Amino acid sequence: MVGRGEVWWGESPDEKGRPYLVVSRDAANESMRRMLVAPVTTRLRGLPSELALGASEGLPVESVASFDNLRPFPKAMLVRRLGSLGARQHEICRAAGATLDC
């Protein structure tokens, strides 16, 4: 099962493959075909809506999950688990709150 706070490699026919951070809740992830994800990028802008990721989350270089670009993504196109936020899952709510200006 794909879980909240996990970093996965995603393949889409519309764009190049890239890592994604799963942000949708686990109860929805079990039954939905699409999950809410934050795309991961190496373009660090220092925004409060970014969540820093790196080697401890399974990425080869310093990166961020961009919550300003949240999107639904087909679960079937998440092809390989790279890592997880682990105890840092609470940071998902912080970045989402910054995105929504809450």
Give a label for each model feature.
Residues K16-A55:
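Compact nucleic-acid interaction/catalytic patches
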Residues E57-C102:
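C-terminal terminal-subdomain/extension
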